[in-house]
Curated annotation (Swiss-Prot):
Sequence similarity: Belongs to the formate--tetrahydrofolate ligase family.
Keyword set, alphabetical order: ATP-binding, Ligase, Nucleotide-binding, One-carbon metabolism
Recorded GO MF terms: ATP binding; formate-tetrahydrofolate ligase activity
Positions with a binding annotation for ATP: 64-71
Organism expressing this protein natively: Treponema denticola (strain ATCC 35405 / DSM 14222 / CIP 103919 / JCM 8153 / KCTC 15104)
Matching InterPro entries: Formate_THF_ligase, Formate_THF_ligase_CS, P-loop_NTPase
Recorded metabolic or biological pathway in which this protein acts: One-carbon metabolism; tetrahydrofolate interconversion
Pfam families per the UniProt record, alphabetical: FTHFS
Protein name from the UniProt record: Formate--tetrahydrofolate ligase
Keyword flag RNA-binding: no
EC code: 6.3.4.3
Catalytic activity: (6S)-5,6,7,8-tetrahydrofolate + formate + ATP = (6R)-10-formyltetrahydrofolate + ADP + phosphate
Length: 554
């Protein structure tokens, strides 16, 4: 089979104006970025259509290092729905440069189920990530200047919370000292997070419009003064400057798939260190024009889907009609104690054992009132008997099941899934959304409910620093914010080596971060870092420009 990049280059793309016209977007509302990419102003959002049309979430079982192919399922389903005559639109996240040059090598789907132009999407795209990085670091520079000027005054800063960000994987930047050298500012310990972990990214993806963006940016807490008063962006009077840097980026990006299905790609927080969903604005824009809108939440259902429901849907008033859990036989075997290098070998017993991981995710999604369909991503190593084993297991539980072969066959390979999705939404759509916790619950109650009900933890403990921060948040009257857990994506627990469905484990909250602008409380567990490092063999060594063509992206 051809490589992803070969398939992408051979695809016959339509001009983006034609894609927009097919959706019913007036040409006055198409802002071209070349021939095949455009921005669409969020002013086109029609709330009546948003409520009427069908939102579908794609999530997954606990992933292997290679992933489960969730984006391939999302794009494949959009292709399959269009294949059977439905008006489908994908609403996905933008890839981060860090993982593209690190482990993943790209995040635009795969095979014959890709969003295009793949090279542009995976690299700089429309500059949204650069705008977010610039906005975040502009705040850093202006706050450092404020700190420098406020020395020796009643406004002097005692505690600095705000770091810097870059869209790279660079472990050397996790802890740094700034201000060294005479006349170079105030010496302080600081660090860098990756751009998808930036609070600006979270705000960008949760804001409903430019004024909401401004309000949230103004409310970001940067640090505390000598009298322990919170210092916010609005105290510096710089929110206008930051909004100016984001005024174009806030509009969602329109592209197309390998079969010219429209897709909005906008925003890109990770689900292990942030809330893991594309922008509310892009999702609502897609729902304005698409009868069926397929979106996804990062990593597995315990991370991305929980945050999608408890944070994004809670705040945006969204109510999905269906949740799809993507799985692979290889991923299930890994949860049945097969080493990752051997998951391509037939092993029915390990597959049966690994189904417990799928069952736990199904159980969790039902807690949110969701109707569930399982989409098994077909790989070249799959054998029919193992596919049937998973099918029969799902059917015995009353859960819909379909094989997705869009990677190899495009939309044709997702027709079975598309037909099942339409039938399920028509006959048994999800119930009104339920949440794991209530706004009025205490911070520890919220964290406890997520850890015990969704992850299956036996207990939750807190470091002294976490306890201290929880008390400070409660005293500030912000305890009603939703909780965003930062933990490993490779296990229900905070230990990435505990596969399957571990029990009896303890979760430790190492730190608590208040994101007062994005209005969420981040609970950091285990060894989770908000700035990833590079692997021993990064994808960057395979990326090159050959005769004007990019090689090594996938």
């Amino acid at each position: 089979m051809k490589t992803d990049i070969e398939i992408a280059r051979e695809a016959k793309l339509k001009k983006i104006a034609e894609i927009a016209d097919g959706l019913g977007i007036h040409d006055d509302n198409v802002i071209p970025y070349g021939k095949y990419i455009a921005k669409v102003p969020y002013s086109v959002i029609d709330d009546a259509k948003v409520k009427k049309n069908n939102l579908i979430l794609v999530t997954a079982i606990t992933p292997t290092k290679a992933g489960i192919g969730k984006t391939t399922v999302s794009i494949g389903l959009a292709l399959g729905l269009n294949k059977i005559g439905k008006k489908a639109v994908a609403a996905l996240r933008e890839p981060s440069l860090g993982p593209c040059f690190g482990m993943k090598g790209g995040a635009a789907g795969g095979g014959y189920a890709q969003v295009l132009p793949m090279e542009d999407i995976n690299l700089h795209f429309t500059g949204d990530f650069h705008a977010i990085t610039s906005a975040h670091n502009m705040i850093s520079a202006l706050f450092d200047n404020y700190i420098f000027r406020a020395q020796g005054t009643p406004k002097a800063i005692k505690t600095v919370l705000w770091k810097r960000v870059l869209d790279v994987n660079d472990r050397n930047l996790r802890q740094v000292v700034t201000g060294l050298g005479e006349g170079n500012g105030v010496v302080m310990e600081s660090g860098f997070d990756i751009t998808p972990a930036s609070e600006i990214m979270a705000i960008f993806c949760l804001a409903k419009d430019i004024e909401d963006l401004r309000r949230r940016i103004e409310n970001i807490i940067l640090g505390y003064d000598t009298e322990n008063n919170a210092v916010k962006v609005k105290d510096l009077g710089i929110a206008g400057s930051i909004v100016v840097l984001l005024k174009n980026a806030i509009n969602p990006n329109l592209v197309q798939t390998t079969e010219n299905t429209p897709a909005f790609i906008h925003g890109g927080p990770f689900a292990n260190i942030a809330h893991g969903c594309n922008s509310v604005i892009a999702t609502k824009t897609a729902l304005t024009y698409g009868e069926y809108v397929i979106t996804e939440a990062g990593f597995a259902a315990d991370l991305g889907a929980e945050k999608f429901f408890d944070i994004k849907c809670r705040k945006a008033g969204l109510n999905p009609k269906l949740t799809i859990i993507a799985a692979t036989t290889g991923g299930l075997k890994m949860h049945g104690d097969v080493p990752e290098k051997e998951i391509s070998k037939p092993n029915a017993e390990a597959l049966k054992k690994g189904l417990a991981n799928l069952d736990k995710h199904i159980e969790n999604m039902k807690k949110f009132g969701q109707t569930v369909v399982v989409a098994l991503n077909r790989y070249g190593y799959d054998i029919d008997s193992e596919l049937e084993l998973v099918r029969k297991h799902c059917e015995a539980q009353g859960v819909g099941f379909a094989v997705n072969n869009a990677f190899v066959e495009g939309g044709k390979g997702a027709v079975e899934l598309a037909e099942l999705v339409v039938k399920t939404i028509e006959t048994n759509p999800s119930k009104p959304l339920k949440f794991v916790y209530e706004d009025k619950d205490s911070i520890k109650t919220k964290i406890g409910k997520i850890c015990k009900e969704i992850y299956g933890a036996a207990d939750v403990t807190y470091s002294g620093a976490a306890d201290k921060m929880i008390k400070k948040i409660e005293e500030a009257g912000m305890a009603d914010f939703p909780v965003c857990v930062a933990k490993t994506q490779y296990s229900f627990s905070s230990d990435p080596k505990l596969y399957g469905v571990p029990t009896g484990f303890e979760m430790n909250v190492r730190d608590i971060v208040l994101n007062s602008g994005s209005e969420m409380i981040v609970a950091i567990m285990g060894d989770m870092m908000r700035m990833p490092g590079l692997p021993k063999d990064p994808q960057a060594v395979r990326i090159d420009l050959v005769n004007g063509n990019v090689e090594g992206l996938s």
